């Protein structure tokens, strides 16, 4: 269990291991490394079953390159153009996981039935997802040819500084909060 001063609320799936002496707790599967709050079975469910729709918009980023800012921009543009019904999470203007989900986390933390409910609630209007993976690792069975992808890039130096502060403060990664930038990089 983590000795980090800030607790986390995510379910974790093991066995987790540290990538090195300074932390970076992750799990391994399919010869890849995943965050410990991913359930590898959930990823497999998505890859076997999820077929995207024409109205799906994907924000594809590496962590700490502007994901939340991009989610905010896209949400505001869509809400200005479309009238979302009240039961659609996008109607709220919120950009959290319940509105603009990270599919692997949604299924890992809440189950595939919750994911399917989200698909039904949002089927008739543009819906937004965000992903932190490479194209070869997209968690879907089939991509609709009209689905849209927004790729966000950032200067690697700025991303490294942002990652440094994020990793130090994220309890689930078990990085020593006292780690220095030179050691981190």
Which positions does each model-derived feature cover?
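PAPS-dependent sulfotransferase catalytic domain
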Residues: 1-185
